[in-house]
Amino acid sequence: MTIQTGRLTDPAVRAFVSAVNAHDRQAFLSLLTPDATMADDGSDRDLAEWIDREIFSSHGHMEVDRESDGGRALLARYSNDTWGEMRTKWRFVVEDDGRISHFETGQA
C-alpha cells in the first residue's frame, strides 16, 4: 500500500520524494549538503550525473510502500523512462541542519 508523500515521517526525506516526483531539480539540490554523495546498488556514483540520468532527464517517480529507521529508509516502486518500474530501497543520512549528506538506492 502506497504511503502518501505528505505522510512520510522524516521532513528531509519527504521533501526529497516530493522534489523527485515534481521533477524539481532546484528543490532537490537545495535538500543536499554541498558535499553530498550517493551510491546505487552498492557503488558510489557521481551525484550530478546520476540525478540527471536517473531522475530529471528520465522523469523519475517514487511510490513509497514502506518506511523504517525513523523515515530514513524507504521501500519504494521507482519508475523512469529508462528502466520502467522496479522495487527499490533507499537510505538517507540527514545532518543536523536537515539536509541530506548521503543517500543510497538499489533494487530491493
Please provide the spans of the model-predicted regions.
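Short amphipathic alpha-helical segments enriched in hydrophobics
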Residues: 20, 24, 55-58
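Alpha-helix boundary/capping and short turn/kink residues
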Residues: 22-25, 41, 83
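A short acidic/small-residue loop/turn micro-motif
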Residues: 107-108
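Hydrophobic pocket/interface hotspot
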Residues: 16, 27-29, 36, 47, ...
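Surface-exposed, charged secondary-structure patches
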Residues: 44, 48-96, 104
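Short, low-complexity N-terminal intrinsically disordered segments enriched in polar/charged residues
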Residues: 1-22, 30, 34
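Short histidine/acidic/glycine/proline-rich micro-motifs that form metal-
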Residues: 35-38, 79
